[in-house]
Amino acid sequence: MKILVCVATCLAVGYYGSLATQSSVNTWFPTLEKPVFNPPNWLFAPVWTMLYILMGIAAGLVWDRYESDKYEVKNALVIFAAQLLLNLLWSILFFGLRNPMLAMLEIVVLLLIIYETHYKFKNISKMAGYLLVPYILWVGFATILNIAIWYLNREI
C-alpha cells in the first residue's frame, strides 16, 4: 500500500507539472533554438511517466523500512519530498514562466538534491537506490539540455 501511495503521489506531481508544460509546449517551446541532441517532444511523457513510477516505488520501499530506522527514513523521505517539489517547480519556471535561465539554475539544485536522495535511499534500501539511477541520468541529461537551450536563446 505504501508503494501505491508513493507512486500515485509522484504521478500526481508529474500531472501538475504537465499542466504548466501544456501551455507552452506547442506555442513558445517550438520557437526556441534547440541543440541537435534535443529529443522529440513525444518522448518526454513516457520517459517521465516511467521515472515517476520508479521514484514512487523507491520511496515506498524506503517508507516500508520506517519501523527499523525512523530517523533515517524520515530524513530520506523529507529530502525526497523536497526534490519532488523542485521537480514540479522546474516545469513552472521553464514552461510556465518561460524562463530557461531561472529553470537552469533550479535544475542544478534539483540534480544535487536528487543525488542526495539517492545516497540516503541506497543506505536504507539498495533497491530503492538503484531505482533512482535512471532519474539521476535523465535529469543530468535534462540539465545539459536546459543549459544548451538557455545558451542558444540567451539573446531572446
Feature map (PLM): residue ranges:
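N-terminal signal-anchor transmembrane alpha helix
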Residues: 1-20
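Membrane-interface helix termini and inter-helical loops of multi-pass transporters
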Residues: 23-36, 68, 153-156
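Membrane-interface helix caps and helix-loop-helix hairpins in membrane proteins
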Residues: 90-101, 124, 152-155
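Hydrophobic alpha-helical segments of small multi-pass membrane proteins
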Residues: 77-84, 103-117, 135-139
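Helix-adjacent hinge/juxtasegments
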Residues: 53, 57-91
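Membrane-helix boundary connector in multi-pass membrane proteins
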Residues: 94-97, 116-130
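Juxtamembrane boundary at the C-terminal end of a transmembrane helix
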Residues: 144-156
